[in-house]
């Protein structure tokens, strides 16, 4: 049985939990002893609006690669540290022609928009050939004049790509980013603050789309990680941006 004052506290907590979804998991865990993992859309609509178009010709950058959906979607982000703490952001993504052909009509129209802006490349075949991806990305880097100083990658499905990168560009500044709340929580928090302050200068619709889809999962210690289960709602470019950001943070001397 609950005594009166305890009842009031409990009611107040229930009311708070209903009104503030973000606080809900905290309250359920602390007040009612129910461990909850919270799912939240991470970026607000305003934070995902693209900036005016700009080029980062011959500028130093960190590259992030998320190759984990090798048969389906492969994502790279170039992150350019700018003056006053801003970051330029450009993305290049790959899918196979089979993946494109299997898309529902509405989704296909969206992907065609990405193809037109140059953020999405279709490679012939059933699954992506990582060496073909490498060749295209390499040509893209040369064409855009990007000066890649470090490379962060999610190790899943990345072995031959990373080995070739090290062979051709040297082993320096290559960072393996293990997925999970322990690694992801701090960089995600910092990217969120940068997005809030409109300091991530992206101008591509694909980046807007990935950020809008981005759901994070919070464990009971308040650590966050990206939720990647949603097959059709692509967030790979956000994962690649995080990989690039971690590589940048771990290699400050490369940008001096």
Residue map of PLM features:
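Conserved helicase/translocase motor-coupling segment
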Residues: 16, 21-77
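Short, surface-exposed connector motifs at secondary-structure boundaries
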Residues: 141-150, 169-174
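Short glycine-rich phosphate-binding loop at a beta-alpha junction
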Residues: 145-157, 162
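Acidic, metal-ligating active-site segments
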Residues: 71-84, 235-244
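An acidic- and aromatic-residue-enriched active-site/binding cleft used to recognize and process polar
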Residues: 66-70, 81, 94, 153-158, ...
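Metal-dependent DNA phosphodiester-chemistry modules and their immediately adjacent helices/loops
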Residues: 1, 164, 168-255
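Nucleic-acid-processing active sites and adjacent nucleic-acid-binding tracks
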Residues: 80-147
């Amino acid at each position: 049985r609950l005594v009166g004052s305890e009842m009031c506290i409990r009611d107040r907590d229930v009311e708070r939990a209903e009104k503030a979804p973000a606080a809900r998991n905290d309250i359920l865990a602390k007040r009612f002893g129910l461990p909850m993992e919270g799912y939240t859309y991470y970026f607000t609509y305003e934070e995902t609006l693209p900036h005016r178009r700009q080029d980062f010709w011959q500028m130093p950058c960190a590259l992030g690669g998320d190759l984990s959906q090798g048969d389906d979607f492969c994502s790279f982000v170039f992150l350019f540290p700018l003056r006053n703490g801003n970051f330029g952001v450009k993305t290049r993504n790959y899918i196979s022609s089979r993946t494109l052909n299997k898309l529902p009509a509405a989704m296909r129209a969206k992907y065609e928009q990405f193809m037109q802006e140059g953020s999405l490349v279709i490679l012939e075949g059933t699954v992506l050939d990582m060496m073909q991806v490498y060749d295209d990305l390499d040509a893209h880097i040369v064409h855009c004049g990007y000066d890649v100083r470090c490379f962060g990658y999610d190790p899943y499905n990345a072995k031959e790509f990373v080995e070739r990168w090290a062979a051709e560009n040297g082993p320096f500044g290559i960072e393996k980013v293990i997925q999970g709340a322990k690694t992801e929580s701090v960089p995600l928090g910092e990217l969120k603050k940068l997005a809030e302050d409109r300091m991530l200068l992206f101008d591509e619709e694909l980046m807007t789309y990935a950020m809008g889809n981005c759901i994070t999962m919070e464990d009971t210690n308040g650590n966050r990680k990206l939720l990647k289960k949603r097959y059709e709602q692509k967030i790979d470019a956000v994962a690649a941006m995080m990989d690039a950001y971690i590589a940048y943070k771990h290699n400050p001397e490369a940008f001096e």
